[in-house]
Amino acid sequence: IILQQMTNKYMYFVANWKMFGSLKSLNTLNKVIKFSKSKEINKGRLIYCPPNTLISSFFKKFQNCLIDIGAQNCHESYDYGAHTGFINSRMLKSVGANYIILGHSENRKKGENDKLINMKIKSALKSKLKIIFCIGESLSENKKGKTKIILSKQIRLGLNKIKKKSNIFIAYEPVWSIGTGKIPKINELEKIIRYIKGQFKGKPPKVLYGGSVNPKNINDLKKINNLDGFLVGAASHSAKKFIDIVKKTYS
């Protein structure tokens, strides 16, 4: 019955292309566009987050279908200014982005702290972008049993003084699972998803799982009760693999 509920609801599939892709990559999207117009997509919602250099091209490519566009990061300032090499949320919105990934562990490792992420989220919300807010614990934190403490802190500080949360998605990505092929046990993931949603008063935000999501493990991952979708890294570079993930979620 739980699985039936999962496969009858809207699920979000976010393709995080990271620092991959060129204009030649646009040709690989034809299969995805065709799939998005078929009944096989079921209630899947596809969101592509390419590098900034490709956002405008992706936007044009996807104009006549239901695939949405997102960015992967932004400068914290809503205002334009003298910030060489950076791009802000307003600029991303102006070239077609509707979503943005913020707080990804790869950026946290480079020095992004909760306060900075909070500033970025506020700026992006002001630009009318929907936020995919990444949270997750390291392997050592997980082994010490600190997962819930870390997630609670990241949520509290990252969303500090943000009252309206309807345009925020939470993406739970255990840092030790990203790109490693290792995923937590399904029953553990279910507890974490429940815990994350329990951090919010009223209607909780939609929660996605990210970390080594691929066509081989999606049949297990789709069993997670109360999950709203997936943040997909490497597997999303392949149209076939990304489509397979969506198909298997609804099969």
Regions found by a protein language model. Name each.
Residues I2-S251:
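Active-site loop-to-helix "anion-binding N-cap" substructures in soluble metabolic enzymes
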